Amino acid sequence: QWVTLIQALAMRPGGPPHLRITLIDDDAVFTSAGGGGGGGLHIVGQQLTRLAESCNVPFEFLPAPAISAGEFNLEKLDIRPGEALAVNFAFQLHHMPDESVSTSNHRDRLLRLVKSLAPKVVTLVEQESNANTAAFFPRFLEALDYYASVFESIDVGLSRESRERIGVEQHCLARDIVNIIACEGDERVERHEVHGK
């Protein structure tokens, strides 16, 4: 998504605006990507910076420390008056506990906070699967159906011997599947939902 945005801004009539991307380190995502402790976030920042330079887009990358589900510190995000704010939730919200796990409902709290910032645009990308509140057997069937499609898609693009494929399957998908099927309560952090929930 960021690559496409940078490329689109580069072609904007009148020249590209200054772009500042602040990414919050989601330990679950960046650890599975091989980074851990902000390492993956650093790699993403380097790649985006190189791309922006090659497209002549004035660019600033700000990594923000990971935040627990209950603490959102706006000062760490360095939101500046007068700037157009966009919020991108790419595979993030399903990691946050909702009212089915805790009465605190950190997901709702985060969404209300984002709304209070009056962003120009909010994008949301999540898996479409009923693996949040379903009982074990229906959740197992949902996971089987969803991940069968994911593996079929991977088959099209990567050979079975591909190191990238093996890494994704072992470090991302396998961990997610085990968490969805074998964990309950607070231990389950993969909580995919269907649209409209």
Residues covered by each model-derived region:
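Conserved SAM-binding loop of SAM-dependent methyltransferases across substrates and taxa
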Residues: W2-P13
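Domain-level detector for long C-terminal conserved domains
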Residues: G15, D25-K197
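Short beta-strand element of Class I
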Residues: L19-T22
